[in-house]
A protein has these predicted regions:
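Core segments of small alpha/beta cavity-forming domains
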Residues: 6-106
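Surface-exposed, charged secondary-structure patches
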Residues: 80-158
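Flexible glycine-rich surface loops and low-complexity tracts that mediate binding to linear polymers
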Residues: 1
Length: 199
């Protein structure tokens, strides 16, 4: 319903982005080799975040923390390091959570991704120029934000609903970063893998 109380049908073209990785970054220095200033940077940042999740282990949480800090453009506090640890250790999630967002991974195959590693993401379904959540929309008028914040989505077998993060483009560097702490929105519990994990 528009602002005149009339019902409208809005056609929206949803773009998808698939990233295929021949090499997988395992630390922040390797992560920095990827260009996140390009037009698709907001999606690439999300793809790199998912790859960062794969590096967390109980014996080496540091690489994952540093990778997320880089993509978030700020150092991770101890509170969020503890949050990350708790989410990764719950149900041994660190063994499959990062893989769950990759193409080919399903609960039935214990979240084993297809090779080569690839991730498919999609843009927001909200209409409007650029899909910024701070722009005027016929049926939704959010608070204006600076910088403009954009949502990037993933649909995957681990959940019956989409997951997303918010990103923004840095005004000086042109790099796309994760907005605030939305990086942890992908850490919500997912469907359990079929077997071979101890709980």
């Amino acid at each position: 319903t528009n602002n005149k109380g009339q019902k409208e049908v809005i056609d929206v073209t949803i773009n998808t982005y698939t990233y295929t990785f021949t090499t997988i970054p395992t630390n922040a220095e390797e992560l920095k080799q990827y260009d996140i200033t390009t037009a698709d940077g907001r999606y690439k940042t999300m793809a790199l975040l998912i790859l960062a999740y794969r590096t967390w282990t109980p014996t080496n949480p540091t690489d994952c923390e540093e990778m997320i800090s880089y993509l978030n453009n700020k150092e991770m506090t101890q509170y969020y390091k503890n949050f990350l640890r708790d989410r990764m250790k719950a149900d041994n999630g660190y063994k499959y959570l990062g893989n769950s967002y990759l193409n080919g991974a399903t609960p039935a195959n214990n979240y084993t991704p297809s090779k080569p590693i690839s991730i498919t993401l999609r843009q927001d379904t909200l209409p409007g120029k650029g899909n910024s959540i701070s722009e005027d929309i016929p049926y939704f008028e959010p608070t204006q934000t600076t910088p403009a914040i954009y949502r990037s989505f993933t649909d995957f077998a681990g959940s019956d609903s989409s997951r997303w993060i918010c990103t923004y483009k840095h005004s000086k560097t042109g790099k796309w970063y994760i907005w605030d702490q939305s990086w942890h929105d992908l850490l919500t519990r997912i469907k359990q893998p079929a077997g071979n994990y101890e709980y």
